[in-house]
Amino acid sequence: MSEEAPKWFNYKPSRIDKMSIPDVPGLKVFIKRDDLIHPIVSGNKWRKLKYNLSSLHIEGLISFGGAFSNHLHALAYACHMRSLPLKAIVRGEPQYLDNPTLQDIHCWGAEIIFVDRNSYRKRYDRDYLASLKKKYPTYKIIPEGGSN
């Protein structure tokens, strides 16, 4: 599949750097610099999210993460760029809004829904996911970390 990005995403293909290891002559080592894809949605985050974000028939997204989740941070930025609503279900308490990750997520327009640890454990529970789908029928649910 192509790694072509949507027009709203300022995507730069990751370069491949050759690395020399003087102690091991003849060894060829190459590093794919996915960290350079984008300053916020980089590396494996882009690879995991690009297919979810290209779905045409969704009106919003729901996903899960902790108070310092790189996944939610990247997803919130991408949703903001696409003008797509995001409901971020976050394990923790509202006082965590003091951290830069959640401040960015909030500034990019995501609705942050704080849940306790017991509620957060339900994020893979079939009945819980069905209740979210019933409540938000036009939203796509993305697992924690974008692992779908």
Model-found features: residue ranges?
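PLP-dependent amino-acid enzyme catalytic core
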Residues: 1-148
